[in-house]
Amino acid sequence: MPTINQLIRHGRKRLKKKSKSPALENNPQKRGVCVRVSTMTPKKPNSALRKIARVRLSNGTEVTAYIPGEGHNLQEHSVVLVRGGRVKDLPGVRYKIIRGALDAEGVANRRQSRSRYGAKKPKK
């Protein structure tokens, strides 16, 4: 415990809030190029093959990003837009690829929550 005199001299140090997506450097999204597109298995109670991409961002950092939705057209050298947001059952995946932006196409035949997957409104 500091004395009152010590507090007057130095004051309390504010704790800095640690960013959950440091590679974005306080930007809402960042552009990047896919280096590798592959699958990954989730943590213990779940079982699947989640689609992920290793992306080199425009600032030079390489991150692992999740590809949401069913089916995708991404391959090596695809240019994608990356946003923050982790996938709870994939360790080390703290970013998501935005569907419907740049080279990532929207999800086909998507009828609900379309805006999240870059899908156009279906014809009547």
From Swiss-Prot:
Which positions bear 3-methylthioaspartic acid?
A: 89
* Cellular compartments per GO CC: small ribosomal subunit
**Is Transport there in the keyword field?**
no
Xref: Gene3D superfamilies: Nucleic acid-binding proteins
Query: According to the UniProt record, where is the region Disordered?
Result: 11-30, 105-124
A GO MF label: rRNA binding
Please list the residue ranges that the record marks as compositionally biased, kind Basic residues.
11-20, 111-124
Q: Provide the alphabetized UniProt keywords.
A: Methylation, Ribonucleoprotein, Ribosomal protein, RNA-binding, rRNA-binding, tRNA-binding
Biological process according to GO: translation
Stored InterPro entries = NA-bd_OB-fold (IPR012340), Ribosomal_uS12 (IPR006032), Ribosomal_uS12_bac (IPR005679)
Note the NCBIfam families from the entry. rpsL_bact
> What job does the chain carry out?
With S4 and S5 plays an important role in translational accuracy. Interacts with and stabilizes bases of the 16S rRNA that are involved in tRNA selection in the A site and with the mRNA backbone. Located at the interface of the 30S and 50S subunits, it traverses the body of the 30S subunit contacting proteins on the other side and probably holding the rRNA structure together. The combined cluster of proteins S8, S12 and S17 appears to hold together the shoulder and platform of the 30S subunit.
Q: Which family is it part of?
A: Belongs to the universal ribosomal protein uS12 family.
Summarize subunit and interaction data from the UniProt record for this chain: Part of the 30S ribosomal subunit. Contacts proteins S8 and S17. May interact with IF1 in the 30S initiation complex.
What is the protein name stated in its UniProt record? Small ribosomal subunit protein uS12
